[in-house]
C-alpha cells in the first residue's frame, strides 16, 4: 500500500492536475495506439500536448488538458513500441497502474471482415466481444476440420467483453442523428499476425464466429487488462476503423483515413457521452 501511494504521489508531483479523485482515478482517459499513423491522428484531437517521462520507464507518454462540462479533463496517450498483443498488454498495464485512467481507449486501424455490402473503408468497428483466434493446437491435417496443407488447427478461443456501461454509451451513438460516423458493433477477432488472405478469415474466424465484424492484433489486450487489473478499474473501449478487408487487396492506402475516423469517433464520444 505504501509503495502504491508513493507512486501516485510522485506522479501527482510531476503532473499537476493528476491527483487521484475521490474514486481513485488519476486522469480522465488514456488513449493507446499501435502504429505511428494512429498516434498522429490522436495528436490532432487536442492542443497543448506535453511529453511525460516516468522514472524507470522507457515509454514516452503525452498529456493534454481538455475542457468539458465546465471541468478540466486530463488525457494521456502513448504508442506501443511494437504491434501486437504482448506490447499492448504491457502498455495498458503500465498506463493503468501509473495514471489510473477512468477510461482506457484504443483507437486506430483494423480489417473489416463483416458482411461485405455493409462495410466501407473508414467505418468504425466497436467490439462488444473480442476473442483471440490464434489460441489453439497445431495437429495433423486429419485431426481437425481446419487444415492448411498438411497442418491442422484445433482452436481454443478465449474471449473478453466490453463493460455494459460503455456499451450503453456506444449504442446511444449508433442511433444518434448527430453522429456522422458509421459504426458497427459486434465481435472482433484478435490474433498474432497480419492477415491478407481470406482463407484465414473463412477457416479460422468465420467458421467459429460467423458474425465477427473485424480483425486486429491488439484489441484483446485492452479489454483483458481493464478487466483483470486491480481497482479502480477503467472502462475500456476499442474503436478501430476499417483500412482493409484482410484479403489480397490489402494495402496502406486507406490507413490515414481510417485512423482519422477512428480518433474522430472517440472525440465524438468524449464530447457527447463520456465527458
Task: Locate predicted features.
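Intrinsic-disorder/coil detector with helix-boundary
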Residues: 2-275
Amino acid at each position: 500500500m505504501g509503495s502504491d501511494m508513493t507512486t501516485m504521489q510522485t506522479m501527482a508531483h510531476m503532473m499537476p492536475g493528476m491527483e487521484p479523485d475521490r474514486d481513485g482515478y488519476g486522469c480522465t482517459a488514456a488513449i493507446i495506439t499501435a502504429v505511428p499513423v494512429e498516434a498522429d491522428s490522436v495528436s490532432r484531437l487536442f492542443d497543448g500536448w506535453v511529453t511525460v517521462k516516468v522514472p524507470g520507464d522507457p515509454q514516452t507518454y503525452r498529456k493534454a488538458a481538455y475542457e468539458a462540462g465546465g471541468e478540466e479533463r486530463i488525457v494521456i496517450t502513448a504508442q506501443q513500441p511494437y504491434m501486437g498483443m504482448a506490447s499492448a498488454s504491457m502498455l495498458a498495464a503500465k498506463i493503468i497502474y501509473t495514471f489510473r485512467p477512468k477510461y482506457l481507449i484504443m483507437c486506430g486501424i483494423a480489417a473489416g471482415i463483416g458482411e461485405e455490402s455493409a462495410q466501407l473503408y473508414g467505418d468504425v468497428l466497436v467490439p462488444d466481444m473480442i476473442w483471440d483466434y490464434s489460441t489453439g493446437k497445431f495437429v495433423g491435417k486429419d485431426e481437425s476440420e481446419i487444415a492448411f496443407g498438411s497442418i491442422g488447427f484445433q482452436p481454443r478461443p478465449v474471449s473478453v467483453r466490453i463493460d455494459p456501461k460503455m456499451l450503453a454509451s456506444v449504442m446511444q451513438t449508433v442511433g444518434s442523428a448527430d453522429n456522422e460516423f458509421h459504426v458497427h458493433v459486434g465481435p472482433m477477432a484478435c490474433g498474432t499476425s497480419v492477415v491478407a488472405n481470406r482463407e484465414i478469415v473463412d477457416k479460422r474466424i468465420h467458421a467459429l464466429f460467423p458474425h465477427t465484424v473485424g480483425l486486429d492484433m491488439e484489441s484483446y489486450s485492452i479489454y483483458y487488462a481493464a478487466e483483470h487489473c486491480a481497482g479502480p478499474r477503467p472502462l475500456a473501449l476499442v474503436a478501430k476503423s476499417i483500412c482493409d478487408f484482410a484479403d489480397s487487396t490489402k494495402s496502406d492506402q486507406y490507413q490515414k483515413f481510417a485512423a482519422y475516423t477512428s480518433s474522430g469517433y472517440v472525440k465524438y464520444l468524449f464530447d457527447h457521452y463520456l465527458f
